UniProtKB/Swiss-Prot annotation:
Belongs to the DNase I family. This is Deoxyribonuclease-1. Keywords: Actin-binding, Apoptosis, Calcium, Cytoplasmic vesicle, Disulfide bond, Endonuclease, Glycoprotein, Hydrolase, Nuclease, Nucleus, Secreted, Signal. InterPro entries: Deoxyribonuclease-1_AS, DNase_I, DNASE_I_2, Endo/exonu/phosph_ase_sf, Endo/exonuclease/phosphatase. The gene is DNASE1. PANTHER family: DEOXYRIBONUCLEASE (PTHR11371), DEOXYRIBONUCLEASE-1 (PTHR11371:SF27).
Length: 284
């Protein structure tokens, strides 16, 4: 019995060591993330617990015109150490008065931001732009991982245009490659890539799915939703040989925070109707 307990403790320690020697990245659509949600102590506590799992986290559906909620989030993430997390946030994006931001929070002792830009998807007032919320792309330096530099392309796709927007991520990928002479690119977010928004018949016309450079890490069979639906809306796609080799096998998955924290469905849905999707990169 004592030997079995010792073996269990050693395995647990090995798991913690492996986690410490890796870089964990996530995309999380926090439904209607703003002042109301961050003013709720229970919800904000769970959000901070979830985000604290990650070295880089992309947050979507940020509805925070004055960045008050973002400031509260950073204060709570940095409660013990003011340098735990830094952030990069986009301008408000959207074709109508409804706007959202993309927000990246990251650990500066693990990665640093080398550059960022808002992808130019055409003339919005003219009605010929491609995305409802065009990607705000960030290039990271990661000295301690096998891949030293990589870009993250975020997308919260409009449900009614999901297939077309996912296809157009191929053009964003080409633009990032040309702009930064960089092959290692991660595309992630709430693509609405499942159920009625993207069906089996759509996939053959989506270049991001059909082209050889891309590996889709979250499968069509995954469930990234909190409610009783079973939809693989949230995805992580990687391109580039170094980045693809750096992915820890089988590390990409939704994080079911409802089960992890023992929450009721009501409480879980108050946090978000999506689970984060996450992936781990190997250390050098």
């Amino acid at each position: 019995m004592r030997a079995a307990r010792l073996m269990g403790a050693l395995l647990a320690l090995a798991g913690l060591l492996q986690l410490a020697l890796s870089l964990r990245i996530a995309a999380f659509n926090i439904r209607t993330f703003g002042e109301t949600k961050m003013s709720n102590a229970t919800l904000s506590n769970y959000i901070v617990r979830i985000l604290s799992r990650y070295d880089i986290a992309l947050i979507q559906e940020v509805r925070d015109s004055h960045l008050t909620a973002v400031g509260k989030l950073l204060n709570e993430l940095n409660q013990d150490d003011p340098n735990n997390y830094h952030h990069v946030v986009s301008e408000p994006l959207g074709r109508s008065t409804y706007k959202e931001r993309y927000l990246f929070v990251f650990r500066p002792d693990q990665v640093s931001v080398l550059d960022s830009y808002l992808y130019d998807d055409g003339c919005e007032p003219c009605g010929n732009d491609t995305f409802n919320r065009e990607p705000s792309v960030v290039k990271f330096s990661s000295p301690s991982t096998q891949v030293k530099e990589f870009a993250i392309v975020p997308l919260h796709a409009a449900p009614s245009d999901a297939a077309a927007e996912i296809d157009s991520l191929y053009d964003v990928y080409l633009n990032v490659r040309q702009k930064w002479d960089l092959e290692d690119i991660m595309l992630m977010g709430d693509f609405n890539a499942g159920c009625s928004y993207v069906t089996t018949s759509h996939w053959s016309s989506i270049r991001l799915r059909e082209s050889p450079p891309f590996q889709w890490l979250i499968p069509d069979t995954a469930d990234t939703t909190v409610s009783s639906t079973h939809c693989a809306y949230d995805r992580i796609v990687v391109a580039g040989p170094l980045l693809q080799r750096a992915v820890v096998p089988d590390s990409a998955a939704p994080f079911d925070f409802q089960a992890a924290f023992g929450l009721s469905e009501q409480t879980a849905l108050a946090i978000s109707d999506h689970y984060p999707v996450e992936v781990t990169l190997k250390r050098a």
